[in-house]
Amino acid sequence: MFEKGLLYDEPSDTLYVNFERCNCATYLGLNDHILLGVDAERSRVVRLMLQDFSILAQRSEFGPRSFPMDGLEEMSPALRKLAMQLAHSPPVNEYLSISMYSPGGIEQVPIITLHTDKLVARAA
């Protein structure tokens, strides 16, 4: 049964953010824990899957945690472009932000930060 909104699976510690019904989702892994469920025919995100959510939601003493988007390295250039476009667009960008970390000022590492306050508020 489809349920729009948030669905938390406690045994797997996975939070599903369902945007619309679609049985044809292809998953694009932004990293090992954050995946976009995409309707490939329409190039549209239908689900955001957050695995090990309790780890992703932990705050540090400095604020929310950010995670490298190392899943992009495994994608073709076309899929990488699509993943970045979708991640920057509604409804996905309501739940996460993408920025760039530049260690040493030369290397560019895309990172992702979840809006955990918004996720927790909507789950309550």
In which residue ranges do the predicted regions lie?
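Intrinsically disordered terminal and processing segments
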Residues: 1-33, 40, 55-62, 66-124
